[in-house]
């Protein structure tokens, strides 16, 4: 399986997925910490990939996503963005609304 295939599978298999530095319990950068805090505030479970333990994904995901930085939040197969977008969406209520909409979609 190529790295692009692995990334695609991770995104398909997880409704809410964040590619981050570190883990939700121990983020390794301030941006990842803020992004995880925003997601946690929304109250739904999410999956994560620690790019520090996956150097192949760390090097290839920016090409796959056409997004150069981390963290990267993916919801329902769509790239939402990085830390600043996540925080902006949290502040204006869009993040929770999107997460609830996607969760409802898969509860049938």
From Swiss-Prot:
Segments forming domain Glutaredoxin: 4-106
MF GO annotations: 2 iron, 2 sulfur cluster binding; disulfide oxidoreductase activity; metal ion binding
One Pfam family hit: Glutaredoxin
Binding site for glutathione: 21, 58, 70, 83-84
Record-listed [2Fe-2S] cluster binding positions: 29
Listed GO CC annotations: cytoplasm
Secreted listed as a keyword: no
Claim: Metal-binding is one of the keywords in the record: yes
S-S bridge residues: none
Assigned keywords, A-Z: 2Fe-2S, Cytoplasm, Iron, Iron-sulfur, Metal-binding, Redox-active center
Protein's cellular compartments: Cytoplasm
Function, as annotated: Monothiol glutaredoxin involved in the biogenesis of iron-sulfur clusters.
Sequence similarity: Belongs to the glutaredoxin family. Monothiol subfamily.
Complexes and interactors: Homodimer.
NCBIfam families (alphabetical): Grx4 family monothiol glutaredoxin
Protein name: Glutaredoxin 4
Record gene name: grxD
